Amino acid sequence: MTLIVSWSLNLLSNFVQAASEEPGKSSVGRKVTGFRLNDTAAGQRSFGELAGRSATVIVFLSTECPMSNNYLDPLAELAGKYEGQGVKLVLINPNRDEGQTQVAKHAQEFQIKFPMLIDLEQTVADLLGAKTTPEAFLIDADGVVRYRGRIDDQYISRLKRRESVTRHDLGVAIDELLAGKPITVAETEALGCPIARPVVPKHAKDSNAVTFNRDVMKILQDRCQNCHRPGQAAPFSLLNYRQAIKWALDIERVVTDRAMPPWKPIAGFGHFRDEQRLAESEIATITRWVASGMPEGDPNDLPPPREFSKDGWQLGQPDLVLTMTEEFEIYATGRDIIRQFVIPIGFDEDKWVTAVEFRAGNARVAHHAIFFTDSTGQARKLDAEDPLPGFSRIGFLPSGAIGGWAVGTQPQPLPDGTGMRLPKNSDLVVQMHYHPSGKPERDRSAIGVHFAKSPVQKQVAGLPVFGFRFQWPEGDDRIKTTGWFRVPVDVHAISVFPHMHMLGKEFKMTATLPDGTVIPLINIEDWDFNWQQAYFYKDPIPLPKGTIIDLESYADNSSRNPANPNNPPRLVTFGEQSTNEMCIGFIGCTADNNADFFDLLRLRRPRAQAGASIKREP
């Protein structure tokens, strides 16, 4: 099968039949013939030249959409599979502002070795009614559209993937067409990034109208630009008006759905520092701006550009920078990667840590990280046993933890006078979570460590609350796990870190004080393994001796859970791998009385019950 990557640089069209379709309107059953494209590698090409003798597949792609990039390898495999059966593949980039330079750079980065064109006038996109990248169209030998929609069911929503593909929709449609059978499913919804249609911004009708310069830009600066700027994790930038109007409809949708910015705790159940949750007024502002035609407004209303650290360290130059000892290679596509890397610290004395900051070596693939310490040498042994850099399983009991990082989060210094002990002669073990980007990548990330500059009065300890369920039965979509812990000494809680794996759905923790007062600690109703992090309270929460911390979680081990790592579902047991399951809530805290700290460490053994039928002690 000839793979013609038709990302149109300059499209000249001459359509003999078929008027343009409204974007999103079904074109299945319509006949498409007679257009010509400018192919920068081979000159002007007609549809007849591009079409396969048995069928033609047209797929719309984008350089900026990560979901689109993740399909480059699968599409190449599809091309190879049908090469000898008369099916050709045409890939078209319909986004106006992804010009020749950007497309050429993208082709080089992703090692695309085929002619590339761009549909600048969106003529082919309009012809087929395409609205999304990636979106596929299967056209038979007579020029009739027989299938349109997704390539497969890898994604269940924007950027949220299944653990494994369960239906290859485009491949099934091709097989049925070649076999002379009716197409079983002729149309599916394509999930991805919207094709950037031409926008003619309107002028503000009155002085009270919402404008980009006065109202919207500040929201983007405060809520979006941590990630949406060059060199960071987001696939596109939101630094100016031109970039914002390109993605405006998409921005409105994801903020209305609260998919972005990523913030999992529900409002009012715990009060946290640097909450990335948009206020209702901010969502309303964006919605009104889009509805009114996205006016730019008075240039004098534009706030000053947000300043970011030039050296990449948001807290300033660290006292110690710990860098992965080797580069790690991330494959182009496939499942996410969880990998541990050992970094020797090399101190012969204990150190007090007040803040840690993560700097991704490759922001395109680094998604989140957790920083453990190991004083036993066991992590080094596991590293030595694995031929690749790092190792793939935990396999050791960490001596402690000093923090973590997730996309979009800010480094969180500990409260004044507190610190985490970094044991002498220990190693840092960094657990990395990587997202494949669509092309082979390399990463060598670093962690900046800040030490206490004044005497530490309180040592921070992690208080684990375990939900001890050892089996998650297959087929059950609401598996309840409860756990509890009685606080042995007076403490102040400063943070909470929920942890479950792929089956997790909901996670809630509360603290019941000795006088019966119930304090909400955290509540997540749409758990996502890919977005776990530590949350720091705005103010430390006093938890007197005898306080009971309750944990309640729900998991889904059915086929209805798209994150289920097993297809079909099977019995899942407690364990360290993402294919196992866990349920733990870590409370970062300090003992009110320093003399009680070692009692806190000694008495923080888990007290938890598996299942709702076992009640905690009064």
Where would I find each of the regions flagged by the language model?
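Short active-site neighborhood of thiol/selenol oxidoreductases, capturing the structured segment around
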Residues: G48-N69, I174
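Bacterial N-terminal signal peptides
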Residues: M1-N14
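Thiol/selenol-based redox catalytic cores and closely related redox-interacting motifs
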Residues: D119-A196
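N-proximal helix/coil linker or "cap" segments that precede and/or mark the start of modular domains
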Residues: L12-G34, G48-A51, T184-A186, A190-H203
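Aromatic- and Gly/Pro-enriched helix-to-coil junctions and flexible linker segments
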Residues: E187-F347, N425-Q431, P436-G438
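Structural microenvironment flanking redox-active thiols in thiol-disulfide oxidoreductases
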Residues: N69-F110, L117-L127
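A short beta-strand-turn-helix
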Residues: F35-T56, K205-R214
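Beta-strand-centric surfaces of beta-sandwich/beta-rich domains
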Residues: P265-F272, L302-W352, E357-H492, P498-E617
